[in-house]
């Protein structure tokens, strides 16, 4: 069920990248700070707390961060248990920031139809653009006890509306 939400209520105000310079990590880490704003004067919106998909296109040097569930490919079978992803409420007329740590070196696993998985190692230190997509809704996502794992992911992929924004960003090493 799609709602007629006022898409101008939720905006991605900023996505900022910084190199994490802590000595706690052997490999480099990138601190990503996402700023969301709820401009509504009355509505509370719910968003997923953690990214559901991260991708890097080395050709365009674009880092994509998704706080939404993509639709499952037809040939993928899901075998994990049902769960409700962590969600955060953004109160009316409020701006919130989330911080994540991503590795500078990421492994991208793809499985072309009928073939074995391909593992590609990506270095995101030369990023020039960040695209962020966030799903939001006026009600939190809830799992029905009768839903199986695949049904949960399909329902989550159809939950709410999405908003996207892109930002020109570079890492200073």
Regions found by a protein language model. Give the residues of each.
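Short structured motifs
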Residues: 15-20, 81-86, 114-118
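Short, solvent-exposed loop/linker segments at the N-terminal edge
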Residues: 22-28
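Hydrophobic core residues within well-ordered beta-strands of beta-rich domains
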Residues: 30-32, 96
